[in-house]
């Protein structure tokens, strides 16, 4: 109603709805056309409010008209709609769109003449753009109006939706009308994320700017006062000019339209980008034999817009190539239209032409339009008195037949012209099935929908017989009849074609069964006596010629419709009703449009369909599959296919549960892997606790859900499967799906989406009815009385049936309790369907899995269910049939669960007016239970939480995780967060939260005293404990022997080391902490270099799956105070260094020695460099270098070869390689294997230098290593290296190994190009695709990274290492003065070893101490001798 009220008044709307879309057409304008137009205008960033007035419509027409020549069909439709609306506003009388366009043209011609006259009168030739962004204010000054956010938003949307397709150019042109260079740059900056495209655009702009400077040299001498300087290329591009200068140039007299010039440059660049994104030539656009003309035209114009040519050339292409490249069917029609035909005339004439359905539709058209059968079905008896000249088959002359011809016999068949047989043996039937003149006896052919909009319904292919006297109504038939006759609507009996269309006919007082055959000219019946005279005749059939008797003017009754015509009687195997009688009763062959719109589906990019061989099947399975598939084929769910389809998916059969019937299964795993991903439209199943209480409820089930939705035509071929034969007796029977297959990944999403669209109108009409839809289950609830409710249910069922969805009565639940989604629903309560836990003596893995599933399902309403001990039984990889003995804990848990399930429990429904409350209880052993309710003791639902996110945790952390899980669950079910009642005191929570606030959040909560309460069992100190002993702990283990040591060194000189077996580095670190806790007093400081150990203990766990961590927790609980600190390993920190030496003795020393053999073996295979071996085998650099030096293949003249590859982060190797006669310049980052490559026009220094500067602009390049090619040794490249600060090194002449990295990468790159070459039209595209694949899609080498990940890691590590080195160097330049305990005298200076967050590690003489930060003064060492302790004051620089 908004559109009616705002755009057109009542009277205007009436006039609007009388205007026809096409001259002589039936369709008229409706309100929906205005709504569509306003939406389209919003896409173009044009105010839809302009449609409300004639002046607004005129402005819109002015904007749209320049883009009409290159615009899409939608743009033309929008222009036509606005033009018609303009005429309605202006009260111009028009009958159709064509008249509206003529009126607009007349007005524009008149206004143009007036404008020319006015211009001549005033002599003012300069026109200022009336469009944004330069407007004239009241004082006559030119003012810049900034480009609007709405326009920018429209531009961003264009790029996002169209992705640099040809439509982008006219849209950019329209959006940037009258813009300044600054505005154009703003537009480009908003889409700057498309870096590759923007780089191409920048290059084009730079080229055009240089060309402008060349053609417009700067005039010598100063600029005259009051005169503006002339713009340079960079000024036009907006980089060196101000906004005021741009406005000045654009409004000057004479103006310099810098905005338009810059816009032209950008469009040139956009053309190049479009060509890259759409690399198809207009010459390659040809119409396929089955392609609808509309689709061909769309492709043609899309590609035409991407062509870089003048408008004149594009017009020539449209006039010649459009017709020339059409398929033969369309070309014949287009040539008949003549050279001056408009595109609209071409589209109308070729509508429905093309493809195998074309001929059948032409015949159907003829049969539906013809009223006098005698004019078409030419029986010889009808033209007895007309003389027909005979014509000779042999010589082609009239007056004699071939038998009497005197000319030499012509070679080959007289009928088809082929050699090898004579006419009597010719197999080409001439049934005259398609006579081109039939379809057009009554003028222009009826317009058929294009192929793409017709989806043949699998259940609606049928033969329709219609006439004026039938009473049975069919909705689809009535519409089709109205289309044919224009005035009278007809009623159609429908005969399905999934079986032979056999009907009962009445002829000569006898009832007979006959076949309706639209492929036969004549009606032929088996031997019978008919009244009247007959004459002999010979007719040709499939089995040869037969002799028949021809009876004329015989009345016959077919399906209640009477006809009179010629009947042939003879020895026919089946009675046939031919077209001579079918046309009289108005019988047509119909392929009705499927009501459900197919969802287009594609394979993943670069993938082809599945080609998995069918495995052998037993005889009974083959028989079952043949039977099932025959039935499915009759129903239209699948279709037979030929050998042209190369795809296959395996099929097999299993017996249904408790039945002798078989079920067909197709293994779509491979197709699923190759099919595009789908967004699951429903992320979970609805829950009954979220249902509102309703007076009346019904549960429906949709029958054959997936098989009611058609599958995308273009995708069907990929669903092909084969039923084999026994012993390969015959070729397998091949089928493909026409509907959504069971087991295919797209079926659920497409079905849900289709179902939602179908239910949407019903939901809108009945807002008070709630429909919960999950797959094929429907829950319908309302507050209507039961009678009214059931009426609405019938309406819903009929609505679904109209769309092809049946709701079987046997699954239609009218009375409670309703079984829905595994739940049992009652009017005022719900529960899960009855759960029976099996009694077993022995339990297999599969049995326990099923048991846990049942208990989890029950836990949503039965409070207190536990499964932790049962789940423990399933740990590890076990076979499904393996028998598992139940532990005592698991048996106890199962017994408790059985007791809980004995008493039935119900949940209530949700009341939106009341708050949600959650209460959580701790069950012990890391298990929690909770209840969600609105009133006490009336639970909406219950649940449990037992997930442990780590091996070591505590109750507060678990409680937090449980709260977050419940909060998420509540948001999903009810859309709001409940209030929580938690068994934890506020003080305990606050203590935890102050340390871990950033990692946890919980909503509003209150304390409830439900034992057992949650508490923290111990706390770690934040500062070192004064007076307590400090333990430096460390551990080490050998990876091969699993032997290890753990120990500690204390500040009081104590030390201890224990040897361990079957251990790891992490375990030894924890063992060392355990030793320190065991051997220390009630207060202790512990210093470790293990981040792993620190992370575990700082989280304050009170339970752990690790026995060792559990022992540490026990020790921590016993202590009064514990301070735990971390220092970095191997940094020379006293206590840490001492304990490291202590535990490493005999352990760490042999670690790298164990790796030497492996490294030597690896080097013999791959000749890896020393850096790779040092990294892969944990070798010291000196050992790795020794392995390389002792390798005879890595030697040159008795010493390590100088060409040994340097893997420093800034080194790149460059080389040129050749492919397909073109030059590819390749740069390889030596350390990572990362590649940059580009096709260059010539192997010159200029191109190489340009490439090198681009490389240096992207990555840190310190050194390049090249061969001695002329382009690399050129002065241009040397100059570029000098400017960018790059060192250039050259390889050893005639030694390819000196360029080994880039040479091997050349080979690798060519190999990848070969793999992707057929996917790209141009080599330069294939090169960039190959570079992308190599850099980001191939992993391996050091770290198992891709080359792209590796280069980033190497550069980041290099920066970090340098920064760390700086810090270490810096830290050694500081001296520390400190105070001990309560002694007020400052001591020092001491050496600073490490500065932590809360404390520092210092070395004073030989003592290493940990001192709190608040008790130290850190000052820089300036190299001067201090006078004494008392001269240290706060005057010094402090840190």
Curated annotation (Swiss-Prot):
Protease: The viral protease is inhibited by many synthetic protease inhibitors (PIs), such as amprenavir, atazanavir, indinavir, loprinavir, nelfinavir, ritonavir and saquinavir. Use of protease inhibitors in tritherapy regimens permit more ambitious therapeutic strategies. Reverse transcriptase/ribonuclease H: RT can be inhibited either by nucleoside RT inhibitors (NRTIs) or by non nucleoside RT inhibitors (NNRTIs). Binds 2 magnesium ions for reverse transcriptase polymerase activity. Residues 14-33 are annotated as: Interaction with membrane phosphatidylinositol 4,5-bisphosphate and RNA. Mg(2+) 1 binds at residues 701, 776-777. Residues 1025-1148 form the RNase H type-1 domain. A zinc finger (CCHC-type) spans 390-407, 411-428. Residues 1374-1421 bind DNA. Residues 512-581 form the Peptidase A2 domain. The modification Phosphotyrosine is found at residue 132. Residues 7-31 are annotated as: Interaction with Gp41. A lipid is attached at residue 2 (N-myristoyl glycine). Mg(2+) 2 binds at residues 1034, 1069, 1089, 1140. It comes from the Viruses. Residues 189-227 are annotated as: Interaction with human PPIA/CYPA and NUP153. Residues 1205-1355 form the Integrase catalytic domain. The keyword Disulfide bond does not apply. A motif (Tryptophan repeat motif) lies at residues 989-1005. It catalyses: Specific for a P1 residue that is hydrophobic, and P1' variable, but often Pro; Endohydrolysis of RNA in RNA/DNA hybrids. Three different cleavage modes: 1. sequence-specific internal cleavage of RNA. Human immunodeficiency virus type 1 and Moloney murine leukemia virus enzymes prefer to cleave the RNA strand one nucleotide away from the RNA-DNA junction. 2. RNA 5'-end directed cleavage 13-19 nucleotides from the RNA end. 3. DNA 3'-end directed cleavage 15-20 nucleotides away from the primer terminus; 3'-end directed exonucleolytic cleavage of viral RNA-DNA hybrid; DNA(n) + a 2'-deoxyribonucleoside 5'-triphosphate = DNA(n+1) + diphosphate. Its EC number is 3.4.23.16, 2.7.7.49, 2.7.7.7, 3.1.26.13. The record marks 132-133, 363-364, 377-378, 432-433, 440-441, 492-493, 591-592, 1031-1032, 1151-1152 as: Cleavage. A zinc finger (Integrase-type) spans 1154-1195. Its cofactor is Mg(2+). This is Gag-Pol polyprotein.
